[in-house]
Amino acid sequence: MIAGTERFTFGTRGKGTYEITQEVQACVDRAGLEQGTATIFVRHTSCSLVLFENADPSARTDLHGYFDRLVPEDAPYFVHTYEGPDDMPSHIRMALTRSSEVIP
């Protein structure tokens, strides 16, 4: 079995969803393999990976709205607010999603 590791960083403009398909595909292409799996992992505690519809931008809008209602910022019941009003909601959203994906 052949295995390789490649790491890339991805800058953001703050809270939101970001398309990283091209970056992941470039890593796979550089590996030069015809078949296998890619494991994608994010190292930040308030960041997650979601495999999601990207053809219609309204799908992202709905996802954002759902999480905003499910885990609102500035909720009076959050105790962990030292790093700002969005920090605890970000951690909860990550716990409800995933920090890694394995893609064939």
Summary of predicted features, one role per range:
Residues M1-P104:
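Active-site histidine-anchored catalytic micro-motif
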